[in-house]
């Protein structure tokens, strides 16, 4: 092994395999760009982003951890969202949920 060397598998790395996905169209109606990170509760994103919010409850972007999607002013794009895993609890963010993301249990 060489210091700093990476030894990677030849098979592709599959993220979020076998997760239920939903595609939604998002429009930035604001005058500033909005960037949303991989694990942000999509239901609670900036209010300048227009989309079917109810569909996004308990969901996050289907993108690799540590990455984000940027929505420029006036731009519309389709994104794929997936359900949170684990205990399915969300705290902080825009202080809307603060607990379980099971449907019907939000503030």
UniProtKB/Swiss-Prot annotation:
<dbReference type="GO" id="GO:0009039">
    <property type="term" value="F:urease activity"/>
</dbReference>
<dbReference type="GO" id="GO:0035550">
    <property type="term" value="C:urease complex"/>
</dbReference>
<dbReference type="InterPro" id="IPR002019">
    <property type="entry name" value="Urease_beta-like"/>
</dbReference>
<dbReference type="InterPro" id="IPR050069">
    <property type="entry name" value="Urease_subunit"/>
</dbReference>
<keyword id="KW-0378">Hydrolase</keyword>
<dbReference type="InterPro" id="IPR036461">
    <property type="entry name" value="Urease_betasu_sf"/>
</dbReference>
<dbReference type="Pfam" id="PF00699">
    <property type="entry name" value="Urease_beta"/>
</dbReference>
<keyword id="KW-0963">Cytoplasm</keyword>
<comment type="pathway">
    <text>Nitrogen metabolism; urea degradation; CO(2) and NH(3) from urea (urease route): step 1/1.</text>
</comment>
<comment type="subunit">
    <text>Heterotrimer of UreA (gamma), UreB (beta) and UreC (alpha) subunits. Three heterotrimers associate to form the active enzyme.</text>
</comment>
<comment type="similarity">
    <text>Belongs to the urease beta subunit family.</text>
</comment>
<protein>
    <recommendedName>
        <fullName>Urease subunit beta</fullName>
        <ecNumber>3.5.1.5</ecNumber>
    </recommendedName>
</protein>
<dbReference type="GO" id="GO:0043419">
    <property type="term" value="P:urea catabolic process"/>
</dbReference>
């Amino acid at each position: 092994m060489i210091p700093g060397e990476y030894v990677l598998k030849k098979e592709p790395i599959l993220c979020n395999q076998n997760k239920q996905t939903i595609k939604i169209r998002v429009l930035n109606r604001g005058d500033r760009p909005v960037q949303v990170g991989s694990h942000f509760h999509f239901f609670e994103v900036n209010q300048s982003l227009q989309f079917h919010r109810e569909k996004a409850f308990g969901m996050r972007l289907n993108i690799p951890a540590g990455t984000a999607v940027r929505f420029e002013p006036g731009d519309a794009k389709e994104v794929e969202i997936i359900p949170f895993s684990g205990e399915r609890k969300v705290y902080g963010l825009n202080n809307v949920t603060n607990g379980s993301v099971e449907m019907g249990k939000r503030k």
